[in-house]
Every structure is written in structure tokens, then in C-alpha cells.
């Protein structure tokens, strides 16, 4: 039907007869000559309908309104002098229409295609209209290119694409499962997979050696900008490998996917140990586009003349006193503004926030009176203070201090007066050497998941046991991660016991895995990359909803289809379900 897409045409096509198809983006009648901006997936081009060129086409054009579906035939010509539109890729040319067909009419649309000021609820209700915006098409073109690149590079490296079940057993991995009632097995339920984790391990036991899948996953959890109840991950597993082997494949995969989207990234990526990330950046997903590294000053504060600080400093195994130097902040923020930073960190458990300012005549601030001249000089030297700098201090329980000082670091870096993060940079970092366990409310939990291989279980403090686990972080966002897995039944049973999962519960939930590990499971490991998050970052969107064709809202509902919805009583009866 068509010979070209709109933006395929240029001055090189002058004089050619072409056939275009798309939607009427806008309509203008200028003294008898009608101009129509035709839009297709590639962009816009101007159609000119002059009664002197084609009376029939002009007559048809006079009845056209926004979003009518058109097919136009005509010749490409240069626009007249002074009539070009530099904002359009095709702004130097137009199509002189000889034949025009209205393939379909449109009701009045609820918003102009491409309008960025439309509320999200309206956009999602009419998502199919929003998708007509060529910029939306470009986002999904990149997504398609990245998926193809992922498949190609993994295929080249000997990986086999295998689909794992969507209807599976409920084995909660931290979030709640989406449950599917069985009609055949009354009172029993399937679960939608939170990940293909156990199935891909079983594929390794089955000798498949190298597996991948672009997998749909489901988690019934509270949503935010970078989460959806259903999401896509690029899932990879390999046998007879170590951590280095897995990370090498992950880097090859990311280089290929970014390259397909026109972005060059260079491996190998930086690495940082989990505990260093927490001590320096207050986060296990640090944004390294800017420095702002926290420094430990607990030894200096232990000698100060302030009982609050000295009491905190007496317990360095459980407490921290951290300093965050912000270059030039004294030249940017007033004292009143710096006081608002204290209000910010109080939201996250801080009891207060101290600060010093580096002036021409030395270090100044309300806390300076508590320190000796020697310790003031030591602070200046250790922190590398220069005139105009401000240093902020956080003190208290180490996890609380890490959290609020890490958040303060991001808050300051992203402040409109600082803008420390390069919006065009892609700064990758591997976070490695994660603790195997964490203790929360007296309960032992797996920091990643219970199938992760520990480095050494012979430690007095369970929180000191490290795992062979690794996360890949990009610009402060966790893209994904993985681990070397437990491949021996005895070790897996021991880890379950440490997590408080008894023998009977382990057999009920994971008996199939434990059975498989009895039959010569190979050493194996893998990773998964959040595809939606990855595309959100590549295409510089603020939410993964912008890179999913038909996303859910933050309430996990679909405004377009009105899902979830009530179902027929007959369906409930067949599923043996009664509603209260």
C-alpha cells in the first residue's frame, strides 16, 4: 500500500512519486490550499492539497480531521522559500497530493498525540493513542533491538533459549506470589513465577550447560516508579563456571545490548565489595557518576568534648560516625537551606545532622567548640577540605547512618543547584562479596535467596558469612544480579536450617530441588537482568511504565482493560471459590 515511511524521504527524493500512509496529525486551510501533517511510526511529513493539482483530493482533504487514517499519493518537492520547518526531519520538503483516500475516520481524541502534559490516568486509559507518538515507537524499537542483540550474543556464546513454566508451585522468594486456582484440583493453587530460578537450576542438573530466557516474572508487591507486578528479565544460567565466568558473560551481554541502542560502553566494569559500598556510599547500589564518598571519623569524635558523640564512638562495632564532604556547597547553600537537610534525614531515622563550613579563616560550625585544634586540623586533612566546602556528619547505629547519609548523598548530588550526575553517562559497577544472611527482628534471612553458595559457613557471627553473589548497578539503579548456586544437597539442607526452614517444610516447598541435587548436579551459577529497568535507563525515561507497551498503574491495575475485575459466579463455582 505504501512506498515509503514519512521520514525516509528527503531532498534526494525530489520529483519522485510516492505513496504514504498514516494518520492526520494536524490540518490547516490556508486560502484554499489545505496542508495536512501526516504521521506514521517514523514521524511527520507535510501533505499539500491544492485544487489546481487535484480537485478531487482537495475535496476529500476538506473533510479530514485529526487522526483520520489516510493513504496519499503524490510527488516530493521542495517547500517554498521561507516555508521550511527546521524542527521536522522532513521540514525542507512536502508531498503534492494527486490521490487521497480516507481509510477510516476518528472520533474526537481525548488529547493531542505527543502532548506531554496529559495526566497519566488519561494516557493509560487511551494507551493505544499514546503509542501513536513516534517517540513512543522509537522507545519500543530500541527495546526490540536490545532483545535481538541479547539473543544473538547469547546464542554466539553457546546458550540455548528454553521456556520454563508460567503455572508453577508457590515458593515465595520474598514478595507475595500471584496465585491461580486450579479447577481440576479443588482447593489447590498454582503460582505465577517470581523468577525462573529453580527451573533454570534444574536445567543445569539436566545437562543443558548454558541456558537463557527473556522471561515474564510476577511479584505481588508494593509498586514504585521502577516496579511493575509483571516484568521482564533476561535470565541466564551456566554450568561448570565461577563468578568470573558469569560476570564476563553478563558484561558481553550488556555491551551488545547497549551497542544495539547506539550506546558504547567499555568493559571491564568497576567492582566494589558490599561492605565498602555501604561504608563509602551508604548503599549497595551506589551511583558512581559523582564521587561524594563518606569518610569514617569515629576515632576523632571519640576524643571530642560532647558526651553524645563519645558514647556513640565507644561502640565502633555497632555504631558509625560518618563525614560527607560536599565541595563548594558553602558557596551554593545558605545556612537555612543546610538546616533543611537535617529535616530530610530525620525522615530516615537520623537524630540530627551536624555540619562544618570551610571558610578563609578555617573550619566553622556549631560543633567546632567540642574539638581540639589538633583534631580540627586532622579533620581538615583527612577530608581534604578546601575553602567553600561543607562537611556533613551522621552518627548512630551503623545501618541507620548508612541509610540516611547515603540518601543525603543522592539528595545533594541531584539538587538543582548541584547537578553532580552527568545525565549522559552510564556508570556501571559490580557489587560483590554480599553477606549471605541478614538478621531482621531476630530472624535470619537470606540477603539474596537461599540457593546462593556461601563462601564459608565457619563463622561465629552469621552476618559475617559472605556469599558468592554479585549485583550489577548502573547509575544508582540495580539492573540485576546473580550468584554461584549451591549444587550439593547437604549444603542446601544446612542453609535451609540456618534460615529456620525445617526438614518437613523444606521437603514440602523444595523437595523437587533437593531430590535433583542428589543426582550429580554440576557446579553452576547465573544472573538475571531487569529488562524493563535497563530500557528505562537507556531511553532516559523516569518510569518503567514508559517502556512497557501496556503497563499497570501504581495500584497494580490496568485502566485500559479495567483489570483486575470481578468474574462470573459460574467461573468462581467451577474453581471451588466462595467470596466473603
UniProtKB/Swiss-Prot annotation:
<feature type="binding site">
    <location>
        <position position="173"/>
    </location>
    <ligand>
        <name>L-aspartate</name>
    </ligand>
</feature>
<keyword id="KW-0648">Protein biosynthesis</keyword>
<feature type="binding site">
    <location>
        <begin position="219"/>
        <end position="221"/>
    </location>
    <ligand>
        <name>ATP</name>
    </ligand>
</feature>
<feature type="site" description="Important for tRNA non-discrimination">
    <location>
        <position position="30"/>
    </location>
</feature>
<feature type="region of interest" description="Aspartate">
    <location>
        <begin position="197"/>
        <end position="200"/>
    </location>
</feature>
<dbReference type="GO" id="GO:0004815">
    <property type="term" value="F:aspartate-tRNA ligase activity"/>
</dbReference>
<keyword id="KW-0436">Ligase</keyword>
<dbReference type="Pfam" id="PF01336">
    <property type="entry name" value="tRNA_anti-codon"/>
</dbReference>
<dbReference type="InterPro" id="IPR047090">
    <property type="entry name" value="AspRS_core"/>
</dbReference>
<dbReference type="InterPro" id="IPR047089">
    <property type="entry name" value="Asp-tRNA-ligase_1_N"/>
</dbReference>
<feature type="binding site">
    <location>
        <position position="228"/>
    </location>
    <ligand>
        <name>ATP</name>
    </ligand>
</feature>
<dbReference type="InterPro" id="IPR004365">
    <property type="entry name" value="NA-bd_OB_tRNA"/>
</dbReference>
<dbReference type="InterPro" id="IPR006195">
    <property type="entry name" value="aa-tRNA-synth_II"/>
</dbReference>
<dbReference type="GO" id="GO:0006422">
    <property type="term" value="P:aspartyl-tRNA aminoacylation"/>
</dbReference>
<feature type="binding site">
    <location>
        <position position="485"/>
    </location>
    <ligand>
        <name>L-aspartate</name>
    </ligand>
</feature>
<dbReference type="InterPro" id="IPR004115">
    <property type="entry name" value="GAD-like_sf"/>
</dbReference>
<feature type="site" description="Important for tRNA non-discrimination">
    <location>
        <position position="82"/>
    </location>
</feature>
<keyword id="KW-0547">Nucleotide-binding</keyword>
<feature type="binding site">
    <location>
        <position position="478"/>
    </location>
    <ligand>
        <name>ATP</name>
    </ligand>
</feature>
<keyword id="KW-0030">Aminoacyl-tRNA synthetase</keyword>
<dbReference type="InterPro" id="IPR045864">
    <property type="entry name" value="aa-tRNA-synth_II/BPL/LPL"/>
</dbReference>
<protein>
    <recommendedName>
        <fullName>Aspartate--tRNA(Asp/Asn) ligase</fullName>
        <ecNumber>6.1.1.23</ecNumber>
    </recommendedName>
</protein>
<comment type="similarity">
    <text>Belongs to the class-II aminoacyl-tRNA synthetase family. Type 1 subfamily.</text>
</comment>
<feature type="binding site">
    <location>
        <position position="448"/>
    </location>
    <ligand>
        <name>L-aspartate</name>
    </ligand>
</feature>
<dbReference type="InterPro" id="IPR029351">
    <property type="entry name" value="GAD_dom"/>
</dbReference>
<dbReference type="InterPro" id="IPR002312">
    <property type="entry name" value="Asp/Asn-tRNA-synth_IIb"/>
</dbReference>
<feature type="binding site">
    <location>
        <begin position="530"/>
        <end position="533"/>
    </location>
    <ligand>
        <name>ATP</name>
    </ligand>
</feature>
<dbReference type="GO" id="GO:0050560">
    <property type="term" value="F:aspartate-tRNA(Asn) ligase activity"/>
</dbReference>
<comment type="function">
    <text>Aspartyl-tRNA synthetase with relaxed tRNA specificity since it is able to aspartylate not only its cognate tRNA(Asp) but also tRNA(Asn). Reaction proceeds in two steps: L-aspartate is first activated by ATP to form Asp-AMP and then transferred to the acceptor end of tRNA(Asp/Asn).</text>
</comment>
<dbReference type="GO" id="GO:0005737">
    <property type="term" value="C:cytoplasm"/>
</dbReference>
<dbReference type="Pfam" id="PF02938">
    <property type="entry name" value="GAD"/>
</dbReference>
<keyword id="KW-0963">Cytoplasm</keyword>
<dbReference type="InterPro" id="IPR004364">
    <property type="entry name" value="Aa-tRNA-synt_II"/>
</dbReference>
<comment type="subunit">
    <text>Homodimer.</text>
</comment>
<dbReference type="GO" id="GO:0005524">
    <property type="term" value="F:ATP binding"/>
</dbReference>
<dbReference type="InterPro" id="IPR004524">
    <property type="entry name" value="Asp-tRNA-ligase_1"/>
</dbReference>
<keyword id="KW-0067">ATP-binding</keyword>
<dbReference type="GO" id="GO:0003676">
    <property type="term" value="F:nucleic acid binding"/>
</dbReference>
<dbReference type="InterPro" id="IPR012340">
    <property type="entry name" value="NA-bd_OB-fold"/>
</dbReference>
<feature type="binding site">
    <location>
        <position position="219"/>
    </location>
    <ligand>
        <name>L-aspartate</name>
    </ligand>
</feature>
<dbReference type="Pfam" id="PF00152">
    <property type="entry name" value="tRNA-synt_2"/>
</dbReference>
Amino acid at each position: 500500500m505504501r512506498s515509503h515511511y514519512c521520514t525516509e524521504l528527503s531532498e534526494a527524493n525530489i520529483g519522485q512519486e510516492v505513496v504514504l500512509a498514516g494518520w492526520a496529525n494536524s490540518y490547516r486551510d490556508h486560502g484554499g490550499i489545505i496542508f495536512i501533517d501526516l504521521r506514521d511510526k517514523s514521524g511527520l511529513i507535510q501533505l499539500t492539497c491544492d485544487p489546481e493539482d487535484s480537485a478531487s483530493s482537495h475535496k476529500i482533504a476538506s473533510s479530514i480531521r485529526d487522526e483520520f487514517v489516510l493513504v496519499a499519493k503524490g510527488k516530493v518537492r521542495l517547500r517554498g522559500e521561507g516555508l521550511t520547518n527546521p524542527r521536522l526531519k522532513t521540514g525542507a520538503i512536502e508531498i503534492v497530493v494527486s490521490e487521497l483516500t480516507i481509510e477510516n475516520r476518528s472520533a474526537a481524541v481525548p488529547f493531542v498525540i505527543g502532548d506531554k502534559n496529559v495526566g497519566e490516568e488519561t494516557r493509560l486509559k487511551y494507551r493505544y493513542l499514546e503509542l501513536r507518538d513516534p517517540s513512543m515507537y522509537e522507545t519500543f524499537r530500541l527495546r526490540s533491538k536490545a532483545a535481538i542483540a541479547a539473543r544473538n550474543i547469547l546464542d554466539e556464546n553457546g546458550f540455548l533459549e528454553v521456556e520454563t513454566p508460567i503455572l508453577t508451585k508457590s515458593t515465595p522468594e520474598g514478595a507475595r506470589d500471584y496465585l491461580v486456582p486450579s479447577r481440576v484440583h479443588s482447593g489447590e493453587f498454582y503460582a505465577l513465577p517470581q523468577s525462573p530460578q529453580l527451573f533454570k537450576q534444574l536445567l543445569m542438573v539436566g545437562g543443558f550447560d548454558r541456558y537463557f530466557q527473556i522471561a515474564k516474572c510476577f511479584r505481588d508487591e508494593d509498586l514504585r516508579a521502577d516496579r511493575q507486578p509483571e516484568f521482564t528479565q533476561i535470565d541466564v544460567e551456566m554450568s561448570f563456571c565461577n563468578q568470573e565466568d558469569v560476570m564476563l558473560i553478563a558484561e558481553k551481554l550488556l555491551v551488545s545490548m547497549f551497542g544495539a541502542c547506539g550506546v558504547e560502553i567499555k568493559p571491564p566494569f568497576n567492582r566494589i565489595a558490599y561492605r565498602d559500598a555501604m561504608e563509602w556510599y551508604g548503599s549497595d547500589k551506589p551511583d558512581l557518576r559523582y564521587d561524594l564518598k563518606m569518610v569514617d571519623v569515629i576515632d576523632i569524635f571519640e576524643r571530642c568534648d560532647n558526651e553524645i558523640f563519645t558514647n556513640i564512638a565507644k561502640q565502633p562495632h555497632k555504631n558509625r560516625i560518618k563525614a560527607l564532604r560536599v565541595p563548594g556547597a558553602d558557596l551554593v547553600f545558605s545556612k537555612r537551606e543546610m538546616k533543611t537537610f537535617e529535616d530530610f534525614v530525620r525522615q530516615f531515622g537520623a537524630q540530627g545532622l551536624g555540619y562544618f563550613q570551610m571558610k578563609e579563616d578555617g573550619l566553622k560550625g556549631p560543633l567546632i567548640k567540642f574539638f581540639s585544634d589538633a583534631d580540627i586540623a586532622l579533620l581538615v586533612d583527612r577530608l581534604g577540605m578546601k575553602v567553600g566546602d561543607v562537611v556533613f556528619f551522621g552518627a548512630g547505629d551503623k545501618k541507620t547512618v548508612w541509610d540516611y547519609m547515603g540518601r543525603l548523598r543522592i539528595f545533594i548530588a541531584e539538587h538543582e543547584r548541584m547537578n553532580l550526575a552527568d545525565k549522559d553517562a552510564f556508570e556501571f559497577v559490580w557489587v560483590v562479596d554480599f553477606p549471605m544472611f541478614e538478621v531482621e527482628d531476630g530472624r535470619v534471612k537470606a540477603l539474596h535467596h537461599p540457593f546462593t553458595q556461601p563462601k564459608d559457613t565457619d563463622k561465629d557471627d552469621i552476618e559475617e558469612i559472605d556469599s558468592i553473589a554479585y549485583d550489577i548497578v548502573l547509575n544508582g539503579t540495580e539492573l540485576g544480579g546473580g550468584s554461584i548456586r549451591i549444587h550439593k544437597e547437604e549444603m542446601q539442607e544446612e542453609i535451609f536450617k540456618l534460615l529456620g526452614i525445617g526438614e518437613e517444610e523444606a521437603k514440602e516447598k523444595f523437595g523437587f530441588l533437593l531430590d535433583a541435587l542428589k543426582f550429580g548436579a554440576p557446579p553452576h551459577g547465573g544472573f538475571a537482568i531487569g529488562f524493563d529497568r535497563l530500557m528505562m535507563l537507556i531511553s532516559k525515561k523516569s518510569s518503567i511504565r514508559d517502556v512497557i507497551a501496556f503497563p499497570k498503574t501504581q495500584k497494580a491495575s490496568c485502566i485500559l482493560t479495567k483489570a483486575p475485575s470481578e468474574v462470573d459466579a459460574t467461573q468462581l463455582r467451577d474453581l471451588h471459590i466462595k467470596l466473603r
